[in-house]
A protein has these predicted regions:
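Phosphate/NTP-binding elements of NTP-utilizing enzymes
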Residues: 1-141
């Protein structure tokens, strides 16, 4: 298998949580309570989770967390890390189509739109795949 593409892949050279705080902007639509540059000071437990997820040695992460503790935000930030440093097809599955649709429209798409540099890491929309959903910004999920 040709692995030459690995030479040009971005490398995460600082802890994942610090990198995210430096490079992710949260719009008011994504984070109504704390818009602006990402800050994990209010969720210190998220730091270790994101560092673990970003580790090349991690194969699986299981979280047991209470309500309103940032699970969705952690999931979206992990997705951004993978899109940036390990680009490959990714499937985010939820229990129902309306729930998945709402997550994409209310959280994921606004997060991508607030951070234009991430858009170049996503494949362009493929109009030929009827099973895929085309969202604003020409991203296919």
């Amino acid at each position: 298998m040709n692995r030459a593409h690995l030479l040009y892949r971005d490398v995460l050279d600082i802890p994942a949580d610090q990198w995210l705080e430096q490079h992710v902007y949260l719009s008011r639509e994504v984070s109504p309570n704390a818009p602006g540059n990402l800050s994990l000071t209010g969720q210190p437990w998220a730091r270790e989770i994101l560092r673990t997820i970003a580790s090349p040695y991690t194969r699986e992460v299981e979280l047991v967390m209470g309500a309103q503790t940032g699970k969705t935000t952690i999931l979206l930030l992990a997705w951004l890390l993978f899109a940036r440093f390990h680009p490959q097809p990714c499937l985010i599955g939820l229990s129902t189509d309306p729930l998945a649709d709402r997550l994409a429209k209310r959280r994921l798409i606004p997060l991508i739109q607030a951070n234009p540099a991430w858009g170049d890491k996503l494949p362009p929309a493929n109009q030929g795949q009827e099973s895929m959903i085309l969202y604003p910004g020409q991203y296919t999920f």
